Amino acid sequence: MLRRGDRGEAVRVLQRCLRSAGYDLTIDGVFGRITLECVKSFQATHDLDRDGIVGPLTWGKLEEVCREVMPG
């Protein structure tokens, strides 16, 4: 699970995926305010709980979307 305040490579992966899905954010490895807003927007778009926490359901949908945008 990832949430606001987290840092590291997993956050970078999250940010790269969000960016590839069309969200405007910096890939810096810090789960701050902008990343939180992007996650909540992604969750709302995909009918997920809009809690800003990247748990199994949000990760699953992100992986699905990333595969569509960046196949292979």
Task: Outline where the language-model segments fall.
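Acidic, Ser/Thr/Pro/Gly-enriched interdomain connector segments
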Residues: 1-30, 34, 68-72
